[in-house]
């Protein structure tokens, strides 16, 4: 019965935008930030590597490879700070952000985890001197924690910070990413967001990370990058 209740809750809310975005009227530079698909790392030239690379995994039901909520909020703030000196990359196929993988033991599919790992590896091989930061929202947090925890030390060292919104394995992982420094991890979990406390019940609080993804999280990532 609990599974059915959770499944129905997920289905009912899947079509809703996970977070209402709150961005300024886009300038010429910021226009690209509103795109739900970002492949700067994949398409970028190694001879023109930026100082910063953001890798993000969207929530279940979100479009593109970035979504149009937490991912674009974080990207917009970082691009305002670093202007043309940052690449933004979403985690795409085979991560399709479907609902059912939330019920898997890892909280997502192995294919999704492997694709995120491929992005971190690509950043390390293509732009080894860039500061890499990452983030995930809802199911995207499961994609990120699994990928980051499985990366070799050299790749983990390049990752300066990871932000997680509505962390679906927050309780199970005790508010951290296993085998990754706690000082490089920042978890944003609203007090009434049930997914942060060992369930998959979606309450309104799960969709209320606009301020965190627009201000608190990018500011923390900027500090992490500057301190590296």
UniProtKB/Swiss-Prot annotation:
Disulfide bonds join 49-127, 189-196. Coiled coil: none annotated. It is found in: Secreted. One of its GO terms (biological process) is carbohydrate catabolic process. It catalyses: cutin + H2O = cutin monomers. Its EC number is 3.1.1.74. One of its GO terms (cellular component) is extracellular region. The 2 disulfide bonds play a critical role in holding the catalytic residues in juxta-position; reduction of the disulfide bridges results in the complete inactivation of the enzyme. SMART domains: Cutinase (SM01110). Keywords: Disulfide bond, Glycoprotein, Hydrolase, Secreted, Serine esterase, Signal, Virulence. InterPro entries: AB_hydrolase_fold, Cutinase/axe, CUTINASE_1, CUTINASE_2, Cutinase_monf. Pfam families: Cutinase. The record marks 60, 139 as: Transition state stabilizer. PROSITE patterns: CUTINASE_1 (PS00155), CUTINASE_2 (PS00931). Transmembrane segments: none annotated. The active site is at 138 (nucleophile), 193, 206 (proton donor/acceptor). Residues 1-16 form the signal peptide. Belongs to the cutinase family. This is Cutinase CUT1. The gene is CUT1.
